[in-house]
UniProtKB/Swiss-Prot annotation:
GO molecular function: beta-amyrin synthase activity; lupan-3beta,20-diol synthase activity; lupeol synthase activity
A biological-process GO annotation: triterpenoid biosynthetic process
Family, per entry: Belongs to the terpene cyclase/mutase family.
Functional description taken from the UniProt entry: Multifunctional enzyme that converts oxidosqualene to lupeol and 3,20-dihydroxylupane. Minor production of beta-amyrin, germanicol, taraxasterol and psi-taraxasterol.
PANTHER family for the chain: LUPEOL SYNTHASE 1 (PTHR11764:SF87), TERPENE CYCLASE/MUTASE FAMILY MEMBER (PTHR11764)
Name of the molecule in the record: Lupeol synthase 1
Organism of derivation: Arabidopsis thaliana
Signal sequence coordinates: none
EC number: 5.4.99.41, 4.2.1.128, 5.4.99.39, 5.4.99.34
Keywords of this entry: Isomerase, Lyase, Repeat
Catalytic activity: lupan-3beta,20-diol = (S)-2,3-epoxysqualene + H2O; (S)-2,3-epoxysqualene = lupeol; (S)-2,3-epoxysqualene = beta-amyrin; (S)-2,3-epoxysqualene = germanicol
Length: 757
């Protein structure tokens, strides 16, 4: 059986190192001897259940580790369930019953180090490049044994669409990019080309013109594999890093994620690296094209993209720049003497940046796309070197196993989920159920704060300060995030107001000051707050977005969600520390409020960048406005936000928004009559922020009834549609959200309806 391990220590692996003894690390191990017949049967039943319902609910319920934790803690619900047939039956007792049942279940899921585990997956282009990299380097079977590979195959099969293709994410229609990547992944994992899944996928690809229509990222990876030719890819010259840093197109100016993707890509492109041409690679050249491989016009193929993948079409200026690099610049840089005088130096510089990122992130890197590229670049530089071995040691940090198989996560969301969990438990006001969990969670947050800036002259490496930050996952990751820092800071401040005997010693004041300093540094002149770094690029740089299937990839920008989190954290901080940077904090909050008001859409909502979508951002926006002292009577933006929510409430009392809202950038209700419990919780809390309980309780009663009646027998809530998002088109499955937010919403509802009133 598979078991989730919460890690301390490195197991004597000399290639693993940590800043805090691996607090928060999550890895999966397979134990052939583990599990009773009943436990193994329960796992198989969970797998069958997902497979049978995979086209109805695309995201897994993340059951394997939950079953393990509940078993280890000998969890029994013990509290009978109460339901409400109408809103008149929603009493203090009914609400408290559902809340207590949910809290009892949720606290049993807390890990020993204080965080709440949970997968963060969804995109179907995460896993294949990892398999490609390990196949090229000859480490596939060394890193992933037969049990790993079986679960990977399960995941790929479970998420194949009925038409034979794979979507950009688990709920998406089929696209060429992910269909090709997952087809090749199946073949590398040993599947026969005539096996049903392969056969249907290959037919989907060929029906749309073959693999020459794959988007740019796909052309890049296929060139590395030797299934495509480098001459058919768009140039990614490493010399861009050698340009003067003041130039607007310098990589140091662009969004950190794109920067950390482009640097290893430019190294591999600059070397025109191609992996071993194995018999399988030769077969793939035959299987994926409509014409003989040797006769393909690669120059023409460079501009061919499947219509299913096109979200962001290249503007003319980008194509002109690409043509100039391809036809005039690259021929010079790849010939003597410039190949020695310039290209070699550029390649050395890119590796310097790669090693810097690797060391400062403990070889986790900023995310899974970058991880694989950096790992492959290290192997190309030195196949037997320690850099590559250190990368191999951190692969388990990215892998996750559930009833739908093994997948690769974007990276962990340990801190993010834990911050929300603590706030939900605090709101529940059930100390007999939550005190121990709050203390453990407090310890995790304290242990996870980044205590220093990146090493050395970090500004010359285009990094921002990180001292005082919290990351999305754990301290070892190292990358500061504004909203993660704000949510963790809120937790520290809220817990500091409680007895240390209950929740542990509060964090040092200086560490709080460091966090405030970081948050203030990430605010732009327009009042909005960026996610990772201050804005360095002009907005027009988005014209050079090299992907066809994502948007907003080039420029660090301000986000309503981040801005709201920071308002709430700074407002709480100034109440507890009124003399620390008082004027700066007050001014920061004023500007942030103005930014939120300025970014409201005509229908009263706000666009969500990190969740689905308008409901998500509206919850944040109204929470930020309320924290800053805005009220329904005095603030037009708040009244318009309330109007949006009340007019989108469904007949069952809940809310449901389609993930298509993210790409279409307009509110689109989800299909069918069923509401989404997580989105219902966001909307419910947003209304509570605005004082809805003082105006009309009926919308809140209706939403509470839906949440209470949807609770499962054991205190869990059902998994529904995907609700996380990034870069307009990519969706993320946060499995823990289905517990955190319904509990939090019920807690806030109980407080304002039955306790305050």
């Amino acid at each position: 059986m598979w078991k989730l391990k919460i890690g301390k220590g490195n197991g004597e692996d000399p290639h693993l190192f940590s800043s805090n003894n691996f607090v928060g690390r999550q890895t999966w191990k397979f134990d052939h001897k583990a599990g009773s017949p009943e436990e193994r049967a329960a796992v198989e039943e969970a797998r069958r259940g997902f497979l049978d319902n995979r086209f109805r609910v695309k995201g897994c319920s993340d059951l394997l580790w939950r079953m393990q934790f509940l078993r280890e803690k000998k969890f029994e619900q013990g509290i009978p369930q109460l339901k409400a047939t109408n809103i008149e039956e929603i009493t203090y007792e009914t609400t408290t019953n559902a809340l207590r049942r949910g809290v009892r279940y949720f606290t049993a899921l807390q890990a020993s180090d204080g965080h709440w585990p949970g997968e963060i997956t969804g995109p179907l282009f995460f896993l294949p490049p990892l398999i490609f990299c390990l196949y090229i380097t000859g480490h596939l079977e060394e890193v992933f044994d037969a049990e790993h590979r079986k679960e990977m195959l399960r995941h790929i099969y479970c998420h194949q669409n009925e038409d034979g293709g794979w979507g950009l994410h688990i709920e998406s229609k089929s696209v060429m990019f992910c269909t090709v990547l997952n087809y090749i992944c199946l073949r590398m994992l040993g599947e026969n080309p005539e096996q049903d899944a392969c056969k249907r996928a290959r037919q989907w690809i060929l029906d749309r013109g073959g693999v020459i229509f794959i988007p740019s990222w796909g052309k890049f990876w296929l060139s590395i594999l030797g299934v495509y030719d480098w001459s058919g890819t768009n140039p990614t010259p490493p010399e861009l890093l050698m340009l003067p840093s003041f130039l607007p197109i310098h990589p140091g100016k662009i969004l950190c994620y794109s920067r950390m993707v482009s640097i290893p890509m430019s190294y591999l492109y600059g070397k025109r690296f191609v992996g071993p041409i194995t018999p399988l690679i030769l077969l793939l050249r035959e299987e994926l094209y409509l014409e003989p491989y040797e006769e393909i016009n690669w120059k023409k193929s460079r501009r061919l993209y499947a219509k299913e993948d096109m979200y962001y079409a290249h503007p003319l200026v980008q194509d002109l720049l690409s043509d100039t690099l391809q036809n005039f610049v690259e021929p010079l840089l790849t010939r003597w003497p410039l190949n020695k005088l310039v290209r070699e130096k550029a390649l050395q510089l890119t590796m310097k940046h790669i090693h810097y990122e690797d060391e400062n992130s403990h070889y986790i890197t900023i995310g899974c796309v970058e991880k694989v590229l950096c790992m492959l670049a290290c192997w190309v530089e030195n196949p037997n070197g320690d850099y590559f071995k250190k990368h191999l040691a951190r692969i388990p940090d990215y892998m996750w196993v559930a009833e739908d198989g093994m997948k690769m996560q974007s990276f962990g969301c340990q801190l993010w989920d834990t911050g929300f969990a603590i706030q939900a438990l605090l709101a529940s006001n059930l100390p007999d159920e939550t005190d121990d969990a709050l203390k453990r969670g407090h310890n995790y947050i304290k242990a996870s704060q980044v205590r220093e800036n990146p090493s050395g002259d970090f500004r010359s490496m285009y990094r921002h300060i990180s001292k005082g930050a919290w990351t999305f996952s754990d301290r070892d990751h190292g990358w500061q995030v504004s909203d993660c820092t704000a949510e963790a800071l809120k937790c520290c401040l809220l817990l500091s107001m409680m007895s240390a005997d209950i929740v542990g010693q509060k964090i040092d004041d200086e560490q709080l000051y460091d966090s405030v300093n970081l948050l203030l540094s990430l605010q732009s002149g327009n009042g909005g707050v960026n996610a990772w770094e201050p804005s360095r690029a002009y907005k027009w740089l988005e014209l050079l977005n090299p992907t066809e299937f994502m948007a907003n990839t080039m420029v660090e920008r301000e986000f309503v969600e981040c801005t709201s989190s920071v308002i709430q954290a700074l407002d709480l901080f100034r109440k507890l520390y009124p003399d620390h940077r008082k004027k700066e904090i007050n001014r920061s909050i004023e500007k942030a409020v103005q930014f939120i008001q300025d970014n409201q859409t005509p229908d009263g909502s706000w666009y969500g960048n990190w969740g689905v979508c308008f409901i998500y951002a509206t919850w944040f926006a109204l929470g930020g406005l309320a924290a800053a002292g805005e009220t329904y009577n005095d603030c037009l933006a708040m009244r318009n936000g309330v109007h949006f929510l009340l007019t989108t409430q469904r007949d069952d009392g809940g809310w449901g928004e389609s993930y298509l809202s993210c790409s279409e950038q307009r509110y689109i209700p989800s299909e069918g009559e069923r509401s989404n419990l997580v989105q219902t919780s966001w909307a419910m809390m947003a209304l509570i922020h605005t004082g809805q309980a003082e105006r009309d309780l009926i919308p809140l009663h209706r939403a509470a009834k839906l949440i209470i009646n949807s609770q499962l027998e054991n205190g869990d809530f059902p998994q529904q549609e995907i609700v996380g998002a990034f870069m307009n088109t990519c969706m993320l499955h946060y499995a823990t959200y289905r517990n955190t937010f319904p509990l939090w919403a019920l807690a806030e509802y109980r407080k304002v309806v039955f306790i305050v009133n």
